């Protein structure tokens, strides 16, 4: 499956890779559950491309809703980190619009809202290959200011 960037997108190094740790969502080396790549665009936006494998199956031949929600959580977290803050999810809400087939490449578009000193709101839209929105999410990410995670975000260029 092609998880290549669009023109003008630059690959991002996830903070867990910079730390030498793993991600519950996207550290599936064999691609059985999910393969994810993160990117930034020329305007500073954050994007993700992903494909779900048989280990993410819910309804026959389709991705489990929890797997979709987990991807949106991680992707919104990457967008929140792009602000230079060390954030964790405080609230996430997901609306499912259509099912996603296993093996189908999807794109996650992320948008930051107006942040406060301690909170970063993020919106995400997961789109199928034709551009149809399969699910949308909003999240509120809380700045925890942890030094160790801050160094990881800096090392990853976020």
Predicted segments with their positions:
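A conserved, well-ordered hydrophobic junction motif at loop->secondary-structure transitions
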Residues: 47-71
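Conserved positions in beta-strands of structured domains
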Residues: 39, 95-97, 109-113, 127
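HotDog/MaoC-like acyl-thioester-processing domains
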Residues: 1-16, 100-102, 113-158
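Non-catalytic linker/capping segments at the edges of enzyme domains
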Residues: 1-49, 157-158
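Hydrophobic beta-strand-centered segment that forms part of the acyl-chain substrate-binding groove
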Residues: 70, 74-107
């Amino acid at each position: 499956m092609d998880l290549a960037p669009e023109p003008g997108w630059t690959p991002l190094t996830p903070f867990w890779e910079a730390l030498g740790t793993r991600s519950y969502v996207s550290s599936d080396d064999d691609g059985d559950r999910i393969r994810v790549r993160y990117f930034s665009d020329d305007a500073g936006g954050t994007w993700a491309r992903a494909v779900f494998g048989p280990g993410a199956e819910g309804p026959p031949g389709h991705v489990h809703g929890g797997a979709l929600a987990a991807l949106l959580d991680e992707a919104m977290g990457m967008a929140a980190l792009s602000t230079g803050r060390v954030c964790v999810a405080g609230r996430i809400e997901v609306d499912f619009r259509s099912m996603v087939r296993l093996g189908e490449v999807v794109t996650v578009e992320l948008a930051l809202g107006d942040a406060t000193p301690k909170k970063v709101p993020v919106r995400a839209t997961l789109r199928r290959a034709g551009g149809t929105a399969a699910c949308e999410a909003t999240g509120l990410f809380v700045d925890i200011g942890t030094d160790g995670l801050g160094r990881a975000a800096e090392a990853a260029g976020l």
